[in-house]
């Protein structure tokens, strides 16, 4: 009962920065160096059993709310409106990642390994603003869940364009996007069945890479009824990758090459996933229940958000991975982080 949410959060953030692989490591490290943890402002350093119980009983949504509150507080440091100024709409990327590469994600099938660490994984579905660098919304599912069922969770807005991969193809969801005047750009599936209605004129297609721009109709099956949905299909040749792409969108008025450029922005979320996996690897879960796994992932996202804000606040240029490594090294040192990072050689220069 005395292990409050604040202490729980600090303990799990310590786990993320120190890259601990077990609850025993988390508890043992903080207890062993308890004299150097005053700046953590912990009211109670947890033992392994205390942390395990808290991960099981404290609702993971609490940590989701903390993440969202931090986003509202520090969001102005993250915004970069250059892209929005060109498109004049909010572009949001929707994608998923499997947190760990091991199978049998939430089920923990089979015997417990000798190491006492259960291998597994969970799929995180993330919405990312193009003019920001951290997730805006997060949902968790079993890895076996089809991606397209998550489209219904997106918020419809006539000032928003969603970008997602063809794994999220769902014609009923596309119909809802059109009804709510919400834009989307995705890739058409290889086996898609459609009827060509009209071919748009392509201007300067050799320069822009647009090979084909046509209006098509697809059949939407819903509640034992079928209806027709009119969309736009663009065939585009990427000179860098030297391959063709076929895009599906409901942006009928936008230039075809601009639609292709919007889809290219989807790579930003891949960079986010790479950043998370490189700097806060989740190779092992510290609990064998869904709630504990979600808490661990939320705390990794909170750590990533805090480091991103620090990076944006600094005038001095720092690589993200170097910032995370620096914090790991100095976890038990009490320093003014921003002041030190602006001039890490200051004390050394004085001595010289």
Q: What is the predicted function of each stretch?
A:
Residues 31-41:
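Extended, structured, electrostatic nucleic-acid-contact surfaces
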Residues 76, 80-81:
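Active-site phosphate-binding and catalytic loops of NTP-dependent enzymes
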Residues 40-60, 68:
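Major-groove recognition helix of helix-turn-helix-like DNA-binding domains
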Residues 1-25, 29, 58, 65-69, ...:
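Single, function-defining residue in the core of a domain
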């Amino acid at each position: 009962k005395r292990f409050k949410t604040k202490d729980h959060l600090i303990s799990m953030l310590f786990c993320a920065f120190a890259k601990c692989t077990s609850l025993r490591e988390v508890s043992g490290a903080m207890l062993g160096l308890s004299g150097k943890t005053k700046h953590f402002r912990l009211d109670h350093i947890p033992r392994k059993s205390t942390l395990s119980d808290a991960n099981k009983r404290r609702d993971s949504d609490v940590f989701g709310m903390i993440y969202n509150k931090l986003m509202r507080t520090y969001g102005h440091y993250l915004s970069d409106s250059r892209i929005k100024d060109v498109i004049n709409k909010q572009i949001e990327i929707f994608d998923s990642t499997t947190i760990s590469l091991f199978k049998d994600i939430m089920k923990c099938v089979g015997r417990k390994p000798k190491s006492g660490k259960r291998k597994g994984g969970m799929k995180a579905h993330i919405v990312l603003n193009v003019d920001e660098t951290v997730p805006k919304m997060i949902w968790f599912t079993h890895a076996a869940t089809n991606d397209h069922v998550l489209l219904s969770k997106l918020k419809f807005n006539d000032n928003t364009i969603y970008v997602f991969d063809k794994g999220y193809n769902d014609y009923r969801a596309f119909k809802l996007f059109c009804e709510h005047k919400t834009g989307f750009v995705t890739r058409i599936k290889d086996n898609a069945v459609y009827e060509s209605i009209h071919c748009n004129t392509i201007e300067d297609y050799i320069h822009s890479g647009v090979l084909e721009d046509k209006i098509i109709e697809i059949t939407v099956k819903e509640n034992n009824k079928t209806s027709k949905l009119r969309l736009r299909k663009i065939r585009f040749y990427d000179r860098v990758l030297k391959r063709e792409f076929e895009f599906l969108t409901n942006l009928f008025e936008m230039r075809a090459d601009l639609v292709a450029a919007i889809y290219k922005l989807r790579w930003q979320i891949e960079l986010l996933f790479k950043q998370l996996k490189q700097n806060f690897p989740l190779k092992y879960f510290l609990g064998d229940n869904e709630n504990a796994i979600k808490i661990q992932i939320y705390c990794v996202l909170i750590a990533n958000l805090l480091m991103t804000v620090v990076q944006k606040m600094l005038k001095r240029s720092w690589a993200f991975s170097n910032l995370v490594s620096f914090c790991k090294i100095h976890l038990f040192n009490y320093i003014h982080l921003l002041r030190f990072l602006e001039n890490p050689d200051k004390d050394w220069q004085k001595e010289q």
